Structures are given as C-alpha cells and as structure tokens.
Amino acid sequence: PGGVRPMYGPIPPGSEWHSPVSTPYDPDEANRILDRAGYPRNENGIRFTVEIDYEPSAQFSLSILKYLQSQFIRTIGVYFRIRTAEDPGSWADRVTSGAFDVTMDELYGWHDPAIGIERIYATNTAAILWSNMSHYSNPEVDALFRSASAEKDPEGRKALYAALQERLSREHVALWLCTIPYATIRNRNVLHVADQPFGVL
C-alpha cells in the first residue's frame, strides 16, 4: 500500500527519536550459519518448519506473511506454516500463554518511545498482549529505557535511544518489516485538526 516505509529497527522512521541502524541483508551468510548450526536442506530444499501466527483481523499482516513465506523458503530453506486463529481472542490466548513459535503483529508506537516502544521490550511487560509478547529480557536494555525516559535533555535522550536501537537490532530481538500509514479524514470546515495520536483519538 502507498505510504508504507521499510523498518530496520525498533523505532520507526519519521520519529524524532529514530536513528539508522546497520542490519545487513546477506542470505548467503544466513545459509552458511544454518548449515553450521546443523540444519541442512532436505530433498525438497527445506531445512525446518516454523509455525507463525498473526492477529486474524489484520489482513495486511496476512498479505505480508504470504510474501515472507515464499521468500524464506526460496532464500534460506525455512518454511513458514501460517496458522490462522478462529478469532482475535484465540490468538491473544496463544500469545499470552506462549503457545506459539513466532507471531506477527501490528504495533502502534504512539508519539514517544517511553509510551509505545519500551513496552515491547521491557522485562516487566512480558506476556502482556501488545507488549513484550516474545518474553525478551535484558537488564541492560531495561536500564537504558529507564534512563532515556527520565532524560530531560533532548540530545542526551536521543543518544540513549540510538544506543537502544543499535543494541536491539544487534540482538535480532524482532524482524521489523514496515510502517503502516494511518489516514485522518476530515471535513474541510473542521479547522486545526491535530495530527498527533492523542489529537485524533
């Protein structure tokens, strides 16, 4: 869809706290790593299967998953078996209980990383829906988030978030894919409409 932008790290491009991170795309090296790890391709070219869930009302996610399914099997021999939940509640139960291999979700970053991004990686939000669903835990990352949210100097805060983005991307905490644009439709007679999330809700 128009307006979608690729993401290479935890804070989306366009945010004042975004910093570029180095996430090289190297399928050849990925294949070498999988070979060394003891996952050879079988006669069908498949190394192993990963079951991947998604929130069933998010049709945009399903479209991306079908594309990734073809790309992963072709480039590195990993097959994604897409599992569709009967309803959003069933998906939520799987995610919060940890009964899944991988899940894909559309998360909203809000206007500040302390509100919208920290919850995705903080140890104390593990297993909470639309928060740290992967159960990721790193005390150093927790400390960086606390320092960044308390930092009053904008430049100092940006430096802390830059360090966080580099750390999280280096640890491959998630596979960040893209942004999803939101549109605000208004009558031309309505003036001074805020374009920030708390203004349009």
Give names to the regions the model predicted.
Residues Y8, N42-G45, F80-T84, G156, ...:
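Surface-exposed patches in mature extracellular/periplasmic domains of secreted proteins
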Residues P1-S22, D28-E29, F60-S70, A92-L201:
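Detector for C-terminal structural segments
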Residues I82-D93:
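Short helix-initiation/N-cap motifs at beta->coil->alpha
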Residues R47-S57, F80-R83:
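Short, well-ordered beta-strand elements
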